[in-house]
Regions:
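Terminal, low-structured helical/coil segments at or just beyond the last alpha-helical repeat
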Residues: 1-3, 99-124
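Alpha-helical segment of the N-proximal tetratricopeptide repeat
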Residues: 8-40
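Structural signature of tandem alpha-helical TPR/SEL1-like repeats
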Residues: 24-36, 58-70, 92-104
Length: 124
């Protein structure tokens, strides 16, 4: 009998692979890998955030917004998740919600120029 459990990657390995795919410009493939990681560890904010990034970069903004919202729910002090949720909300017509999350991101990390630019862009 062959034991194949050693061949099955765990959530951490899948997260690492997904992040690598994102860094190398392959968001679609990253979304597939990170989706598998989410099935293994659905309450890990880091997986939800990375999956949200992959989905956002793949053009699946509504799905990305859901992942970022879950990441924020799991880890409310995750400034990047608030930032990304704000961007996703802005792209899906939820301006008020976008501003709220972008303000939180800026408050959590005032030195992040990208956060401030995004807030200014949405606020008008």
């Amino acid at each position: 009998m062959i034991d194949r459990t050693e061949d099955v990657p765990g959530a951490y390995e899948l997260l690492t692979k997904g992040r690598e795919l994102l860094r190398n410009g392959h968001p679609h493939q990253a979304a597939l890998v990170l989706g598998k990681a989410k099935l293994l560890e659905p309450e890990k904010a880091s997986i939800r955030e990375a999956l949200g990034r992959a989905l956002y970069l793949s053009g699946w903004t509504l799905r990305a917004r859901r992942e970022f919202a879950k990441a924020v729910q799991i880890d409310p002090v995750n400034d990047y998740a608030h930032f990304a949720l704000g961007l996703s909300c802005s792209k899906t017509g939820q301006r008020t919600r976008a501003i709220a999350h972008l303000k939180l991101a800026v408050a959590m990390r005032p030195s992040a120029e990208a956060y401030r630019r995004a807030l200014a862009g949405v606020s008008g």
